[in-house]
Curated annotation (Swiss-Prot):
Disruption phenotype: No visible phenotype under normal growth conditions, but mutant plants have reduced inhibition of primary root growth in low inorganic phosphate conditions. Pfam families: Cu-oxidase (PF00394), Cu-oxidase_2 (PF07731). The gene is LPR1. GO terms for molecular function: copper ion binding; oxidoreductase activity, acting on diphenols and related substances as donors, oxygen as acceptor. This is Multicopper oxidase LPR1. CDD domains: CuRO_1_BOD_CotA_like, CuRO_2_CotA_like, CuRO_3_CotA_like. Its cofactor is Cu cation. One of its GO terms (cellular component) is endoplasmic reticulum membrane. Its EC number is 1.-.-.-. Cu cation 2 binds at residues 150, 196, 564. Binds 4 Cu cations per monomer. The Cu cations are bound as 3 distinct Cu centers known as type 1 or blue, type 2 or normal, and type 3 or coupled binuclear.
Length: 581
């Protein structure tokens, strides 16, 4: 541990001189270079439906595996009618077809999809990045990238390990890189996923630049009886994120860190003042008086959304993250953290008005930050056709019954602790899981096919969305740490990182917060409340069958788990996960 920290300090000293020199050339940027967000009129751009790519072939009516070639390109994108075109990094089958977000990949249960992800990015990044947080740093320049299919259950070599990065033309590759083509088995439960960059220390800037896209796994035999809305018009992914812009249209990211003598550029959270849906700022969508299905993905770096409709219309939740619920849940609002997915049906026939705004009222940072304003409190507008029509879609009483969260089946209990460290000025410097940097030897070694209880102890003031690669989990309970003696417990944990020795049972006796009804299904991300212990039941096997994985989950480079606030993930809030047999 000591030697790891020493190596980090040496590297920091070496790169600090370079970073500070670069900062001198950028820190003179004036506020008047920023685009005045109030000048952008809302609801003037139509909601795009992103291009579709199909991860399967149909030959004489028989569905067969397919291979896709998807590139990452430097291009320009119009986020708003009145905003100059923005330099971005975008996924697509060619530069001219690249989009932000990238194309939606449609796949079929049980049919393999092979994707060769190709890096066509330039030598230099379009955004500032911080060399002191140990990012992937190629010797010959270029922008490291690697794609992670978020929510996917597949072999480690196709998981998009942060150290499996590569530069343009595969000229340079990271220490964990193994192959050019990734294999997605598509043998898990049907549901929603998304793909995004996952390069070490660069995830936050690569996603800000535009490297995100939706991925849908369909199982027609299972899903058809539900009679949910189908077809491109009525079944739409909505990828939502926030950005700020300069007057020239370029993405604005603060180039000065909150602790510039430690991290010249890194800041604990990025928040933009413009809300983007499918690549357009506050778009509009003309809808008919009938049911629509929206697969909503929060692709923000750090912003939580608490969605609601301005006229009180209901959400009917049918899925959470990559799995269906056991039955639909009706709700007036939905809290979605970065990287979470919610699958909803909205019945516009029941709308009392001709127009309705999808709005947001989540403070930022969540939960105790600033309240929303006029700009980030609105997401998009729906304009409803006044003519009624026959709607054959239904809301089924039941969906898919997966196994319950039976804690008695767990083979062991692990304690996972979240820490934030601050400077003398009380500004965050870095965040750790279990008090360990990412490079420290693996400590979580679940056995394939088993279930574990994880007691996640959040000792910070932020809500951290915990994402576990490969595993699926159910949230069992959320218990507040007692305020009396909390500082004593934090001090003990900071020194020892041993929940049992620090008498967790003595402090985890506060108020219990019920798990929201639409979040009681199987998830791969969940919001860890500050000052709470959240018990989750993690399953390292399929939930829809007792069959074993069709791949070897013990291969290198293994998997990871981490906070999905990207600015935290990039600054050490990630740990390796090694599955054993």
């Amino acid at each position: 541990m000591e030697s790891l920290l020493c190596r980090r300090r040496i590297k920091r000293v070496m790169v600090l001189i370079i970073a500070l020199t670069w900062l001198r050339s950028t820190c003179g940027e004036l506020e008047d270079q920023l685009f005045e967000v109030g000048k952008l009129k809302m609801f003037v751009d139509d909601l795009p439906d992103m291009p579709r790519l199909y991860g399967f072939n149909s030959v004489h009516g028989i569905i067969k595996p397919a291979s896709l070639q998807i590139g990452m390109f430097s291009t320009k994108w119009k986020f708003h009618r009145d905003l100059p075109a923005t330099p971005v990094f975008a996924y697509g089958t060619s530069r001219s077809k690249a989009t932000v977000p990238g194309p939606t990949i449609e796949t079929v249960y049980g049919v393999d999809t092979y994707v060769t992800w190709r890096n066509h990015l330039p030598k230099s990044h379009i955004l500032p990045w911080d060399p002191t947080i140990s990012p992937a740093t190629p010797k010959h320049g270029g922008i490291p990238t690697v794609v992670h299919l978020h929510g996917g259950i597949h072999e480690p070599t196709s998981d998009g390990n942060a150290d499996a990065w590569f530069t343009a033309g595969f000229r340079e590759t990271g220490p964990k890189w193994t192959k050019t083509t990734l294999h997605y088995e598509n043998k898990q439960q049907p549901g929603n996923m998304w793909y995004h960059d996952h390069a070490m220390g660069l995830t936050r800037v690569n996603l800000l630049a535009g490297l995100v896209g939706a991925y849908i796994l369909r199982h027609h035999a299972v899903e058809s009886p539900f009679q949910l809305p189908t077809g491109d018009e009525f079944d739409r992914p909505l990828i939502i994120f926030d950005r700020s812009f300069r007057k020239d249209g370029s993405i604005y990211m603060n180039a000065t860190g909150n602790n510039p003598s430690i991290h010249p550029q890194w800041q604990p959270e990025y928040f933009g003042d413009v809300i983007i849906v499918n690549g357009k700022a506050w778009p509009r969508l003309n809808v008919r008086r009938r049911k629509y299905r929206f697969r909503i993905i929060n692709a923000s770096n750090a912003r939580f959304f608490k969605f609601f409709f301005s006229n009180g219309l209901d959400f009917i939740v049918v899925g959470s993250d990559s799995a269906y619920l056991s039955k639909p849940v009706m709700t007036k609002s939905i809290l979605l953290s970065p990287s979470e997915i919610v699958d909803v049906v909205v019945d516009f026939y029941k709308s009392p008005s001709r127009t309705v705004v999808l709005a947001n009222d989540a403070p930022y940072p969540y939960p105790s930050g600033d309240p929303v304003n006029e700009e980030n409190g609105k997401v998009m507008k729906f304009i409803i056709n006044n003519e009624s029509e026959d709607d054959t879609c239904t809301i089924p009483k039941k969906l898919i019954n997966y196994p319950n969260a039976d804690v008695s089946n767990a083979v062991l209990t692990r304690y996972i602790s979240m820490y934030e460290y601050v400077s003398n000025s009380d500004e965050p410097t870095h965040l750790l899981v279990n008090g360990l940097p990412y490079e420290a030897p693996v400590t979580e070694t679940p056995k394939s096919g088993t279930t574990e209880v994880w007691e996640v102890i959040n000792l910070t003031e932020d809500n951290h969305p915990l994402h576990i690669h490969l595993g699926l989990f159910k949230v069992v309970e959320q218990t507040a740490l007692l305020a009396a003696g909390l500082e004593e417990f934090k001090e003990c944990m900071t020194k020892q990182n041993d929940a049992v020795k620090c008498q967790i049972s003595k402090y985890a006796r506060g108020k219990k917060t019920a798990v929201t009804a639409h979040e009681r299904g199987w998830k791969n991300v969940f919001k860890m409340m500050p000052g709470h212990v959240t018990r989750i039941l993690v399953r390292f096997s399929y939930i829809h069958t007792n069959a074993s994985y069709p791949f070897d989950p013990t291969q290198e480079p293994g998997y990871v788990y981490h906070c999905h606030i990207l600015d935290h993930e990039d600054n050490m809030m990630m740990r390796p996960l090694k599955v054993i047999i």
